[in-house]
Amino acid sequence: MAWRAAASTCAALLILRWALTTAGDLKVEMMAGGTQITPLNDNVTIFCNVFYSQPLNITSMGITWFRKSLTFDKEVKVFEFFGDHQEAFRPGAIVSPWRLKSGDASLQLPGIQLEEAGEYRCEVVVTPLKAQGTVQLRVVASPASRLFLDQVGVKENEGKYMCESSGFYPEAINIIWKKQTLKFPHPIEISEDVITGPTIKNMDGTFNVTSCLKLNSSQEDPGTVYQCVVWHESLHTPLRNNFTLTAARHSLSETEKTDIFSIHWWPISFIGVGLVLLIVLIPWKKMCNKSSSAYTPLKCIMKHWNSFDTQTLKKEHLVFFCTWAWPSYQLQDGEAWPPEGSVNINTIQQLDVFCRQEGKWSEVPYVQAFFALRDNPDLCQCCRIDPALLTVTSGKSIDDNSPKSEKQTPREHSDAVPDAPILPVSPIWESPPATTSITPVLPSQPPTLLLPLQ
């Protein structure tokens, strides 16, 4: 009995070996290096080549593509092909049957998105053999870059140049400033008076960032070329934006300043002493008592940070937007955002509309913080914010054309952006009295551009 069982096992092994030898060798090859990079929204082909020792018969073979995302350690089926059956589990996914005859089992995906990055596995079955291969797919988005001059709130002979990069992925990016003078034609990197803000995530998963260069044209040579250089892994070569400094306004020489001062310093001294006595010393106590505890709107929000529903917003982002980005925006009705913040309903509304029209959805939740501050009189009183700022003092209200806009009422915050938190560098201030918590409501879809007053 034992001899017969051993003989049967030996015969089975010989038959299996003969079948495998007859079937031939099956092998799958993917992208060299194991990683494939593709631009966002491109039509991508993920390569998979099948090598078989015999001619392929697609009616008796199977192809299945799987994807494992970067965030979840679980495979999902993307496409399958067996004989005359094929099914796409991702819209538009396809493997060309006529290319498969020559061993090309590549997967085609139109309009690739960021969330579709991950590990792709190509599994090929030619009965009784099976082979597979994997490749990492990375999706990148190239930044769009622009350079502009911010003329809001700058002094004479000063300039604030903004270099904005938007819509890039992944988050890592490098922005540097260089200058090239007539005397030194080789570009050199600038390290002083450069401020680069935080990277802000957009609703589509891409990122934005702004870098600022401050210049005093009276201290720079006319004809100097300045350059903003943007490096990102999606770019083959860096993006470069240039501007040339024009001739600075004439200012007095040191000799002229010295001559003028030597002639007039006596009367200037007496006048200066008089001004100090009249303007500073006499009302000093009254001024201190009145203004020592007053706060700007931005400072008030920072001070009472825990009174707001901040969610995932960051203080440093609010500071950057309020002091750098928003003052450079050209708002309607002649409004301009002050670096210290605002509780003027016209100014806040126009900034809110501008951010929505320009697709700056990540900034809208930070604007909502000023709406929330304005709609809390107790907090405004606690911060000693000027009551005049709580009324419509300039511009044109968004509801001016409405017959029901005779009376201004507090604004509802039901139009905030999805996934938006409220609010930016924590200075240390004196502890305020306890205040009531403010919780703006955040919807699940992008809001409309009009913000009517109820």
UniProtKB/Swiss-Prot annotation:
Residues 24-262 are extracellular. SMART domains: IG, IGc1. Residues 439-454 have a biased composition (Low complexity). Its main location: membrane. It is found in: Cell membrane. Residues 395-454 are annotated as: Disordered. Residues 1-23 form the signal peptide. Residues 143-246 form the Ig-like C1-type domain. It is a single-pass type I membrane protein. Residues 397-416 have a biased composition (Basic and acidic residues). Glycans are attached at residues 43, 57, 208, 216, 242. Residues 27-138 form the Ig-like V-type domain. Residues 284-454 are cytoplasmic. Disulfide bonds join 48-122, 163-228. The keyword S-adenosyl-L-methionine does not apply. Residues 59-62, 127-130 are annotated as: Interaction with NCR3. The chain crosses the membrane at residues 263-283. Residues 291-429 are annotated as: Retroviral-Gag-like. Keywords: Cell membrane, Disulfide bond, Glycoprotein, Immunoglobulin domain, Membrane, Repeat, Signal, Transmembrane, Transmembrane helix. Gene3D superfamilies: Gamma-retroviral matrix domain, Immunoglobulins. GO terms for cellular component: plasma membrane. Monomer. Interacts specifically with NCR3. Triggers NCR3-dependent natural killer cell activation. This is Natural cytotoxicity triggering receptor 3 ligand 1.
